[in-house]
C-alpha cells in the first residue's frame, strides 16, 4: 500500500520504518526541516516501562491544589478560555479513581514493556548508537510518605512480572554513587533493573536515515493542511506543497493531531502538556548519575547521556505556549544541583521546552478510526520515547491485518467513542473544513 505518515518525531519515524519493513511504500510529511525537531528533540531520555504511569491518579486533585502554592511545583495549570482544556481536565478527574488508575497503568506498562523489546530488536538489527545505557532507573523518594505510597505501583509491577528492587538510602547510593552528598535527603528508592536510557533525538535521526536508505521518502518543510476524503474514505493529504495520495494515512502529529481529524467528526482527546529540560555538560563524571534518577518530589528525571546530563520534567497545562519561563529553568537546575551538585556546568546548560500529547488516561491512541483509511498513532504524553517502537509495531500489524503480539483492543480510539457514534456511516464526514 501507499501510506503517508504525518509527523517525523520518534513515533512517526518508527511507524514509517516498521511499515516500510513490512513492504509498504511510505512517505513521511513534516513541517520541520529534519526529523525529531519538536517534542522528540530534548526529552528526559528515559526508556522506563516500569514507570509508565498515568498522571491521573488517586490523590492528584488534592496535590494539584497544594502545588499551586509551591515555588517548584511539578504541575502548573494555566486556565484558558479553551473548551478542549476544560474537557481534558474533567476527563483527568474522572480517571483519578483507584480502579481507573490500576487499569490505565496496567495497560501502559503492557505497551511499554513490549516497546522495550521492540527497541532491543531495532538496536540489534540496525546497530544504531544513541548514547544508550542498560543500567536500570531509580525512582528517588525524599520522604517515608512517598516510599509508602509506592506500594500501589509495586503491586502493579509485581502483577506484570516487572523486575524491581525496593531500596533504602544506602541501596540508592550503591546504585547511584553520585548521590552520596545528598544522603541525608533520601528516604529510599524504587529501582527498575530492566529500564534503559538513551538520546531520543539521536535515535530518531539515525532511524530516519536508515528508513530513507530503505526507500521511505521524507518531505520536510511541508505543512499539513487537511485530509483528503472521497466516498467516505481518506485518500490522501493536502499540504503546503501539494497533495499526497495514499491508500492509508497515519496521523502521528502529537498535540496537533486533534485539529487535523476534527473536521472528520472525530474528537480525539489529546491535549498539549508542556514539559521542560536542560542539557548540562558533565564536568565531574564521578558526581554524575549512572543512569536515570527520577526525583519523585518534583517529578523531574535526571539522566546521563554520554558526556551530558539531561534534566527534564514538570507538567504545565497552558495550551500551545512555547515560552521558556526562567522559573522553570530554575526548578530543573535546583533539582540536579541538589542531588548531583558539581557534576555538571549549569552555566552552559541549554534550555528547551516541548509539548507532550497527553490523553486523560495516559495511554496513547494507536489503531484504526471509524474513517476508512485513517489510522492513529498519537497521544503518548511523557512516554513517546518509551512507547514508540512498540506502538509502531502494533500499528504495522493492525494495518496488515495481523494480530499484534500484545493485547491491543484497548489502545484504539474506540475507548473514547460512544457505541452509537461508532456505528455512524462515513458519509457523514465533512472533508472540506480546514484542519489547522
Curated annotation (Swiss-Prot):
InterPro entries in the record: DadA, FAD-dep_OxRdtase, FAD/NAD-bd_sf
NCBIfam families linked: PRK00711.1
Name listed for the protein in its UniProt record: D-amino acid dehydrogenase
Cofactor(s) the record lists: FAD
GO CC terms in record: cytoplasm; plasma membrane
Family recorded in the similarity comment: Belongs to the DadA oxidoreductase family.
Organism from which the protein derives: Cereibacter sphaeroides (strain ATCC 17029 / ATH 2.4.9) (Rhodobacter sphaeroides)
Binding site for FAD: 3-17
UniProt keywords, alphabetically: FAD, Flavoprotein, Oxidoreductase
GO BP term, example: D-alanine catabolic process
Amino acid at each position: 500500500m501507499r501510506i503517508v505518515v504525518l509527523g517525523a518525531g520518534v513515533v512517526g519515524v518508527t511507524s514509517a520504518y516498521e511499515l516500510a519493513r513490512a513492504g509498504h511504500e511510505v512517505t513521511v510529511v513534516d513541517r520541520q526541516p529534519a526529523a525529531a525537531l519538536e517534542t522528540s528533540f530534548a526529552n528526559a531520555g528515559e526508556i522506563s516501562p516500569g514507570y509508565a504511569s498515568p498522571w491521573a491518579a488517586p490523590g492528584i486533585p488534592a496535590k494539584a491544589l497544594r502545588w499551586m502554592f509551591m515555588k517548584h511545583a511539578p504541575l502548573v495549570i494555566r486556565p484558558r478560555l479553551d473548551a478542549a482544556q476544560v474537557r481534558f481536565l474533567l476527563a483527568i478527574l474522572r480517571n483519578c479513581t483507584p480502579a481507573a488508575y490500576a487499569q490505565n497503568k496496567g495497560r501502559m506498562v503492557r505497551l511499554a514493556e513490549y516497546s522495550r523489546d521492540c527497541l532491543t530488536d531495532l538496536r540489534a538489527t540496525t546497530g544504531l548508537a544513541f548514547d544508550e545505557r542498560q543500567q536500570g532507573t531509580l525512582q528517588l523518594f525524599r520522604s517515608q510518605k512517598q516510599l509508602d505510597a509506592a506500594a500501589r505501583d509495586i503491586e502493579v509491577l509485581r502483577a506484570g512480572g516487572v523486575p524491581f528492587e525496593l531500596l533504602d538510602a544506602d541501596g540508592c547510593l550503591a546504585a547511584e554513587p553520585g548521590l552520596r552528598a545528598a544522603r541525608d535527603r533520601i528516604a529510599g528508592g524504587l529501582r527498575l533493573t530492566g529500564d534503559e536510557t538513551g538520546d531520543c533525538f539521536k535515535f530518531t535521526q539515525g532511524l530516519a536515515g536508515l528508513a530513507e536508505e530503505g526507500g521511505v521518502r521524507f518531505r520536510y518543510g511541508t505543512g499539513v493542511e487537511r485530509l483528503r476524503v472521497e466516498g467516505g474514505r481518506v485518500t490522501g493529504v493536502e499540504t503546503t506543497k501539494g497533495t499526497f495520495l495514499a491508500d492509508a494515512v497515519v496521523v502521528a502529529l502529537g498535540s496537533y493531531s486533534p485539529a487535523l481529524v476534527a473536521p472528520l467528526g472525530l474528537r480525539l482527546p489529546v491535549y498539549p502538556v508542556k514539559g521542560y529540560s536542560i542539557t548540562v555538560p558533565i564536568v565531574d563524571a564521578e558526581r554524575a548519575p549512572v543512569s536515570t534518577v527520577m526525583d519523585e518530589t518534583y517529578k523531574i528525571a535526571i539522566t546521563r547521556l554520554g558526556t551530558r546530563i539531561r534534566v527534564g520534567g514538570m507538567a504545565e497545562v497552558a495550551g500551545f505556549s512555547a515560552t521558556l519561563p526562567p522559573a522553570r529553568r530554575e526548578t530543573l537546575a535546583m533539582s540536579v544541583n541538589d542531588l548531583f551538585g558539581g557534576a555538571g556546568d549549569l552555566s552552559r546548560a541549554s534550555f528547551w521546552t516541548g509539548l507532550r500529547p497527553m490523553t486523560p488516561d495516559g495511554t496513547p491512541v494507536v489503531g484504526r478510526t471509524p474513517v476508512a483509511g485513517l489510522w492513529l498513532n498519537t497521544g503518548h504524553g511523557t512516554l513517546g520515547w518509551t512507547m514508540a517502537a512498540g506502538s509502531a509495531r502494533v500499528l504495522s500489524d493492525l494495518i496488515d491485518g495481523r494480530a499484534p503480539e500484545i493485547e491491543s483492543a484497548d489502545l484504539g480510539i474506540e475507548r473514547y467513542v460512544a457505541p452509537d457514534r461508532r456505528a455512524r456511516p462515513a458519509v457523514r464526514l465533512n472533508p472540506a473544513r480546514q484542519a489547522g
